[in-house]
Amino acid sequence: MRRGKLARLRELGVDPFGGRFDTTAAPGDLKAGFAEGLAVRVAGRILALRDMGKSAFFVIGDIQGRIQGFIGRNEVDERTWEIWKLLDRGDWVGIEGETFLTKRGEPTVRAKSVTVLCKALRPMPDKWHGLADRELKYRRRHLDLLANEESAAVFLLRSRMITAIRRFLEGRGFVEVETPMLQDVAGGAAARPFETYHNALGMPLTLRIAPELYLKRLLVGGFTRVFELNRNFRNEGISRRHNPEFTMLEAYCAFGDFETMAAMVEDLVCHLAETFCGGLRIDHKDEEGNVVRTIDLSRPWKRATYRDLVAGVAGADWFDLDPAGRARRCREELGVEISDAMADHEVTQQVFEKLVEEKTFDPCFVTHVASPLVPLARLNREDPRLVDVYELIINGQEISPGYSELNDPDVQRERLEHQSGDETQKVDYDFIETLEHGMPPAGGIGIGIDRLIMMLAGASSIRDVVLFPQLKRRPSGGAGE
């Protein structure tokens, strides 16, 4: 049917795939600032169509808005009417006409001419039906955006929030920079990188797991407030909280510390919530729209030490037990799965993640973790077994780590060499040499943008806030199958 109409359009001398069409306003803007009697040119996809024989009401729009249109057989020439009758829901059109209000008060464009911009050869989906179609939504995001206004709203929200984050930081004197995605040494985090090879240079490279070491080079070079908002890549698991490529903000403030950055993150998140979510209470709903949890971002946010939180769930004597005793308690009393290959601090971290982090929904700054967990942070002066850091937990997951950055090159060398016992880690000796030129004391933060938007948008999966999440390839079928 659609291909038959395509052929007929061509017979009429109409290019079914259009070309340039100058507009006076977008559909949503035209409706928002509506006035009667205006001559307008507006373009969009036909989203709804009600044919009444000699006339038709229709809706055209895009991801940012829509407006109603009207066309009457007696109000256009014969050729325009014939072209109109060859159009379907899903086609892209340009409309030239005049604005008016219907008897029901609906802003409408009375079409005088119609320009075909693209004849769609496949129909639009009607709607999605719950969980049965979730994976199809992720694989064919274009159809999800067409059928689901809520999905479109989330991605518009994401775009506006990212713009607001940049403005917030620029307003505090931070300069945005770009650092390499392809790196000789994958540093700045404990994660397994994706590996590739540069043929012209004859050398292996990795996709970056973090920009941290390059941003610190800029502190050495004289930047005092610097940030990067870009992609990182980690060759690790996929879950509702993890995607192999993800958007990350990292920012560094010379002469600050982890407390400086904690205050700034609290300001930033509350600013986003008040600007885009209508307040500091964020409802999270199930598939039926029932509120299952409300996250309260009211200030001041809770602060607690890592040690106190772990002892609170694992026992006041947890840190007095030997490694065998801690392992036994995990298996016999706490129900926390651990492996024999885990180091002692990794066992404690597993307890923290399962019994504290995953059950903490309102904001909590967790401070002063064990030094082996964060080799790039400054040691605590009172207890060098700990580092001066925070981990911000909201909605059962880490949203942002913040550090007092380590700037002693000798200590940094020792700690990175100790960490490199993990086969995924290599020591970036060029970075250590850079530190020898002098890096000012600084506070640093990372914010997982995808997780932050999940929390603020009330989304249950990272796939709901990433336009094209990574999915396992299906064994057969065409693109997107």
PLM regions: where:
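Class II aminoacyl-tRNA synthetase catalytic cores and aaRS-like
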Residues: 1-481
